[in-house]
Amino acid sequence: MRVAVTGAGGRLGRALIAALEDAPFTGPLGPLAWSRPAYDLDDPEAAVRCIRQTVPEVVIHAAAWTDVDGCAREPERAMRRNALAVAELADACVRSGTDLVLVSTNEVFDGRRTDSRGYTPEDGPRPGNPYGASKLAGEAAAQAAFLGHGGLIERPGAPGRSGAPGRSGAAGAVSASAAVGMPARPAAAPQLAIVRTAWLYGPPGNDFPVRILASADRARAAGEPLHVVGDEIGSPTFAPDLAEGILDLLASGTFAGIHHIVNAGAVSRADWGRHILAALEVEVPIVETSLAAWTRPSTPPAWSVLAPTALPSGEPLRPWQAAFADYRPVLARERAGATRR
């Protein structure tokens, strides 16, 4: 199976490339790494060009503009990168018979749920910020493209999802002429999988654990406690684990539909921060604050918990605590190296 990964230089992209290199179904040539400048979200021709040149059987779209505050400041750019770029890619995929795995986010939900249940794919999405709106528009664009050209957006026989985006949003901007010269592989209807995840972390740096450790160091130097939000709750997800979950889908051969793939469990930002500091033996007290106390362009959903969907192997992702235990040595080495410098 020839698999291409967009955003191959990013957090999830790197994890996917590493996992695919060891996967038995990718063959001797290995995965295709699409990244800038060859694949650029701002380039309307990038999808057609990359598919025509490399002829993948599956594209995993991990590229996105994930700067949530930037999306709030520049919502038109957010739509360009997270919706129109998806529309162009989905159109190119379905016209060439290429399967598409679209990575999306918990922020398609507004987080106002009060029953302490995780969001399922059957729950109707309702974004509460421009980033979530742009990602939901991307989901809708991909579904519209696949529905419009005979692709599969559900596993055969699967019940319909009331929460699936309809035919609206950015898909209308896709030109039928965009796929001129595309390779065609019509042996089977191409599949679309939408994979939503949450609170992604892992190498290379600048994730929540790295930032909380840096903030704790500054607080300790100032002799102050660390203030962390206590009423934002979610599902921390380790990028290598998410990559393995996506490969689980691909290995099954039949993966169309909406999937929620996160490490099991839920935790507040403050308690996750405490867990990180304890694991790295950093003794700085955390004082809980509220989301309302922070002023920023984008407001994250207070309840970001996704209910994991069953993977084809039957094995869900492990609890977030076990996943973080594998990341802890990486953080420890980085901190030790920074101290020596």
Identify the residue ranges that each predicted region occupies.
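Adenosine-cofactor binding site in Rossmann-like domains, unifying the SAM/SAH pocket
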Residues: 27-49
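Glycine-rich NAD(P)-binding loop of the Rossmann-fold in SDR/ketoreductase-type enzymes
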Residues: 42, 73-88, 125, 129, ...
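C-terminal amphipathic/interface module of NAD(P)-dependent oxidoreductases
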Residues: 282-284, 299-341
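NAD(P)H-binding glycine-rich loop region in Rossmannoid oxidoreductase-like domains
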Residues: 41-81, 92-94
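Conserved Rossmann-fold NAD(P)-dependent oxidoreductase catalytic core, especially the SDR/UDP-sugar
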Residues: 87-130, 150-156, 171-180, 185
